[in-house]
Design a protein with these regions (language model features):
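Surface-exposed, low-hydrophobicity beta-strand/loop segments enriched in small/polar/acidic residues
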Residues: 1-145
Length: 145
């Protein structure tokens, strides 16, 4: 059986509306995006900003990773650099289109996918997260948190 056949790939989506509160942009508190059970292969993870992010104070940052490795996918990025209609695939988000970087595809994980705000709060904005994955273990699954 081919690992990357359309029949074994699953897609899940989650939209986060940041408001600066705990779990939604408060610095130092994780933003839960996807809950992972078992082992899964991330085929592709695509964060797309639909409403630009703002900060409550200078230099608010946002990283994307998993519990225990908070920058596995994307290192800390200044929140105000993530604008509407941009793909947040690295620390310099891109409009229009971009080749998906290696850090956002073909990654094996067992932990929940989270965003980590730091320094000051990410006060407003919206990011949609689209994930395509393949379960590796019999209990491998991902759901929106």
């Amino acid at each position: 059986m081919a690992l990357y056949s359309p029949g074994n790939m699953i897609t899940v989506h989650k939209t986060i509306t940041f408001d600066g509160t705990a779990g939604l942009g408060l610095a130092g508190t994780a933003v839960p995006i996807f809950t992972v059970t078992g082992e899964v292969l991330v085929v592709a993870l695509v964060p797309f900003c639909t409403t630009l992010l703002t900060e409550s104070g200078a230099t608010a940052t946002l990283a994307l990773g998993v519990t225990g490795s908070t920058a596995l996918f994307i290192a800390a990025t200044n929140s105000v650099d993530i604008d509407a209609n941009e793909f947040w695939v690295d620390t310099t988000p891109d409009a229009n289109g971009i080749a998906l970087p290696a850090a956002l595809k073909d990654i094996v994980i067992t932990d929940n996918i989270i965003a980590t705000p730091a320094v000051t709060n990410t006060a407003t904005g919206v990011i949609r997260f689209d994930l395509v994955y393949i379960p590796l273990s019999t209990d491998g699954a991902v759901v929106a948190s």
